[in-house]
Amino acid sequence: MEQFRNIGIIGRLGSSQVLDTIRRLKKFLLDRHLHVILEDTIAEVLPGHGLQTSTRKLLGEVCDLVIVVGGDGSLLGAARALARHNIPVLGINRGNLGFLTDIRPDELEEKVAQVLDGHYLVENRFLLQAEVRRHHEAIGQGDALNDVVLHPGKSTRMIEFEIYIDGQFVCSQKADGLIVATPTGSTAYALSAGGPIMHPKLDAIVIVPMYPHTLSGRPIVVDGNSELKIVVSKDLQIYPQVSCDGQNHFTCAPGDTITVSKKPQKLRLIHPLDHNYYEVCRTKLGWGSRLGSRDD
């Protein structure tokens, strides 16, 4: 296992709890005589930190490991910036669900110490890359760890579009939108829209229609190496949007084409050795616990 010496820290802004956790993490890492680098935006709200700072983009070039303190949204943003550097990312949960940031603040020192001592699991999570084209010219590009979503934006009208997979026509749909999700994103927006839960090790993509205007509109799971093309109807009266992880947005026009495929670079997500995906689902989604013993 890799030994980490240069540790980057990214944190969610606007939370005193995040700042308190970062202070604890900083002290813990410095006590182990490690080189700690703060993302510049979080460094601005930590006066007197005395540490080297870096932009998020450059953290991937100077660090062996990046620790994200925040919720899943914080890790999504970090993943898109760091995946191309092949740098491992570890999450400490200061958000809500915490599917990706799975270390609790109360176990920070214990779990981070295990990782630093080489006792950890590595998961390679693939991202999606999306491109919006108008008259054969790219007008917007973005990456997503969770999902790429076509939606009506501020309008309440339905969208009509065609779906192609690897150049083959699949169907046309009239719906509130369309979600294209990775296995990582299958427990996010896609799940709320009725999509299946996919184990993160699966090499697959799920296509989930949002409130389709037909009883036959159902999610489709396709090979992870597929290229998806969504063609917005030329007769559409609104300008829908494409969102990547709900954080990057592009406005489409009638007739635009959205291409979605797997990004070559993957996120290296670090977990403690006792990480259990099904336990995470059971805890976060409220699944039933073990049946009690019976006196037969």
Curated annotation (Swiss-Prot):
Record Gene3D superfamilies: Probable inorganic polyphosphate/atp-NAD kinase, domain 1, Probable inorganic polyphosphate/atp-NAD kinase, domain 2
Chain sites annotated for binding NAD(+): D72, G73, N146, D147, R157, K174, D176, T187, A188, Y189, A190, L191, S192, Q247
GO molecular function: ATP binding; metal ion binding; NAD binding; NAD+ kinase activity
UniProt cross-references to InterPro entries, sorted A to Z: ATP-NAD_kinase_N (IPR017438), ATP-NAD_kinase_PpnK-typ_C (IPR017437), NAD/diacylglycerol_kinase_sf (IPR016064), NADK (IPR002504)
Key words of the record: ATP-binding, Cytoplasm, Kinase, NAD, NADP, Nucleotide-binding, Transferase
Protein family (similarity comment): Belongs to the NAD kinase family.
Protein name: NAD kinase
